[in-house]
Amino acid sequence: METQKRHEYHSVCHTCRRTENTRMKVKMMSSSNRVLVIALALTLYIVEVASAETLCGGELVDALQFVCEDRGFYFSRPTSRSNSRRSQNRGIVEECCFRSCDLNLLEQYCAKPAKSERDVSATSLQIIPMVPTIKQDVPRKHVTVKYSKYEAWQRKAAQRLRRGVPAILRARKFRRQAVKIKAQEQAMFHRPLITLPSKLPPVLPPTDNYVSHN
């Protein structure tokens, strides 16, 4: 009887140990899954924060000049009469410096939109009398107001070059322009100071009127 009781006790303890081991394994698996979920959430948050880049001050002006080039740019988007009541004009400084900035947003604040080949061909074929005289007077007002604010930035070109191009402009669209600029700088740097003639000077034949001074 005692042996049977001992055998039953050992068998019960063995089953208890098995159940405890399985419970521990389940707990370990659940904790590892939680750690993986937390790590994935952190990585997604870091990627979102990194993608939402902000530009302020001189970096914002450099980015606008690099994107818009000769077209010029505005700090506040020109609003129409229909959209002035519905939406508030926040401005590029508030959007890029305090929220997030991307290339599409910078393109919206350029003064003149980039015309495609279809638009250029369509405007060249259309003949509109007396309209060019009106269009020529409008941009002059914007140019006088626009470029008078940036004379200080144009004088400090060395500081803009030291800061470099922001990371948001390292897209595929603007890499070709950077390569062209570098090629032009290298061509100007490696230009020879003295250009040697390609042809040798003509050799004169020896003359018979040679006088020896010995």
UniProtKB/Swiss-Prot annotation:
GO terms for molecular function: growth factor activity; hormone activity; insulin-like growth factor receptor binding; integrin binding; protein serine/threonine kinase activator activity. GO terms for cellular component: extracellular space. The keyword Signal applies. Residues 91-111 are annotated as: A. It is found in: Secreted. The insulin-like growth factors, isolated from plasma, are structurally and functionally related to insulin but have a much higher growth-promoting activity. Acts as a ligand for integrin which is required for IGF2 signaling. This is Insulin-like growth factor 2. It comes from Oncorhynchus mykiss (Rainbow trout). The lineage of its organism: Eukaryota, Metazoa, Chordata, Craniata, Vertebrata.
